[in-house]
Regions:
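Acidic/polar, solvent-exposed loop/turn segments
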Residues: 1-550
Length: 550
């Protein structure tokens, strides 16, 4: 017969509790073969017989302070029809006999120690020497003579006590788990300001995932662990490889040693996951930057991504006599651990050289009459000066590339410059407008191209090429200059910085609003011939040879 400690009254966590059990009267009586004899029937009675006092029962109390939970020995003492098992002033069970029927009842009062920690439902038996505890049947005939017989109840495991183990389970409602680190760290070369080197799943949030119970044996301990299934487990994350077109490097794989899981690739450690086995707190520590595939967002995040059950956080509940039970939550399949990107920085230098490029119409190719020594149909914003306008940084993901472009807002954009029209009183012709095709912006009017602006996308050098002369309104100065003049932001030079995993950032300087590109005039030339004169002015080609007063 057995009782089971999984009782609500004892704090049991199981559902199979049994508070009392009996050796039935029928079974007890069937152990014997009495006869009254010639004097006829008198009576039959039953009793328990315990030899001695404070008799060791082979059972023990539970002591949470002891490593294996084994407490004081439970001893037996008898008073009348009741034998009580007790230790340290606490009663653990009773054996009671009905003296008339022989029924014996085992009543469980408190839980006892069970040494088998591999089975939370194991049983231990009351264990005494042969003949120490017996059940006695006494037969009395009609004139009072009596005889007795006994069966042993202590040496054969008659009375058993089944264990109650702890319960480990998940809470019905629990806070979500999440930890995010950010690569924008000085230690990683990051340029952002929101870097996060480590993040945790707090002990409180971890513990709130579970609903443990120690059961009837009382509190032992609760511990936590990470469980990774396999070695070199693909994490769904990648290293950064500047040599790859999209920057995606080798797969980062996971391996566990004790309480630490490390994500690594090619001999480089990228992050660790560490658990505090006492509290359950899990810390994600970022050691190096990982690849992010979204090139449209320099602050996107990627998640550690594993199959269901590959990475779990385990809570193990151990009761006072060493039985344990475990429950687990998944940490790999739900985007719990995230890694935010660091993008490049594009900005302007605090101090930079001024930008300017001037061409001069006093060119033979344009019929110029001037003799400017430095006349040229081409002028450049040098690569060095252009690059000095900016202050780029690649950030934690490392160097990708730097490129340059011209950006013109709109089409047929008024340049502030004009063609020359000899038919107009002041020579001002049609407005020269700007249009862009690729790396070239062309200024044209009436089907005639007057100049081009061309950028070298690799170096940033911008070349102004003069194709035809433009109108100059200052008639008092034959060598005056006019500037390309646009609204702020209409024509800009853009530097685009791209890091190793494809994120990009841009900065720009204005080229249209600050007189960067200038066009110097060519004036007429006066020749003295026979007391008279003639003049030539490229801005008035119809008047290339006019007589003037002698």
């Amino acid at each position: 017969m057995f009782v089971d400690e999984s009782l609500v009254s004892l704090g049991g966590a199981g559902t199979d509790g049994v508070a009392s059990a009996s050796l039935s009267a029928a079974d007890v009586q069937a152990q014997f073969n009495p006869a009254f004899g010639a004097d006829g029937a008198g009576s039959i009675g039953y009793s328990l017989a315990l030899t001695g006092s404070n008799v060791a029962s082979g059972l023990y109390a539970v002591d949470p302070a002891v490593a294996n939970g084994q407490g004081a020995a439970i001893v037996l003492n008898q008073v009348g029809n009741v034998i009580t098992g007790s230790a340290g002033g606490v009663d653990y069970f009773t054996l009671t006999i009905n003296p008339i029927t022989g029924e014996v009842t085992l009543a469980l009062l408190d839980n006892v120690w069970h040494g088998d920690t591999t089975n939370a439902d194991d049983s231990v038996a009351l264990t005494l020497g042969q003949g120490v505890l017996t059940l006695v049947q006494t037969v009395t005939d009609a004139d009072g003579d009596s005889a007795s017989a006994a069966v042993d109840l202590g040496a054969n495991g008659v009375f058993r006590f089944e264990d109650d183990g702890p319960r480990a389970g998940l809470a019905v409602e629990a806070p979500s788990l999440g930890a995010t680190v950010d690569e924008s760290l000085v230690s990683l070369g990051g340029v952002g300001t929101d870097g996060v080197a480590s993040a945790t799943l707090s002990a409180a949030n971890v513990q709130a995932q579970f609903n443990p119970a120690f059961g009837a044996d009382g509190a032992g301990s609760i511990g936590y662990s990470l469980a990774l299934t396999g070695s070199n487990v693909a994490s769904g994350l990648y290293a950064v490889d500047p040599a790859a077109a999209n920057g995606q490097g080798a797969a980062i794989v996971l391996n566990q040693v004790g309480n630490v899981i490390t994500g690594s690739a090619g001999g480089v450690d990228y992050f660790t996951l560490t658990i505090n086995p006492s509290t359950g707190e899990v810390t994600l520590a970022l050691l190096d930057n990982v690849w992010h595939g979204d090139t449209t967002n320099a602050d996107d995040s990627v998640a550690l991504t594993l199959g269901q059950g590959v990475l779990t956080l385990v809570q193990t509940v151990t009761d006072a006599d060493g039985d344990s039970a475990s429950a687990a939550v998944d940490l790999g399949a739900n985007g719990v651990f995230r890694f935010e990107d660091d993008g490049p920085r594009a900005g302007l230098a605090v101090e930079a050289p001024s930008l300017g490029a001037s061409v001069d119409e006093s060119l033979v190719s344009l019929g110029g009459a001037g003799s400017d020594v430095y006349s040229s149909d081409r002028a450049s914003l040098s690569a060095a000066n252009v690059q000095a306008q900016f202050n780029p940084a690649f950030g934690a993901d490392g160097a990708g590339s730097i490129g340059y472009s011209l950006a013109l807002t709109g089409s047929n954009v008024a340049s502030g410059l004009y063609a020359v029209d000899p038919a107009a009183a002041n020579g001002q012709g049609a407005a020269i407008v700007l249009n862009q095709v690729g790396n070239v912006i062309t200024g044209s009017a009436g089907g005639v191209d007057y100049f081009t602006l061309t950028i070298n996308p690799s170096t940033g050098e911008v070349t102004l090429a003069l194709l035809d002369n433009v109108w100059h309104g200052d008639t008092t100065n034959a060598d005056d200059s006019v500037a390309l003049t646009l609204g702020q932001g209409v024509l800009i030079l853009v530097q685009t910085v791209t890091d190793a995993d494809g994120d990009s950032a841009s900065a720009a300087v204005d080229l249209g609003a600050n007189g960067v590109f200038r066009f110097e005039d060519d004036g007429p030339e006066r020749d003295h011939q026979r007391g008279g004169g003639r003049w030539h002015h490229p801005d008035h080609p119809g008047c290339a040879d006019h007589r003037v007063g002698q």
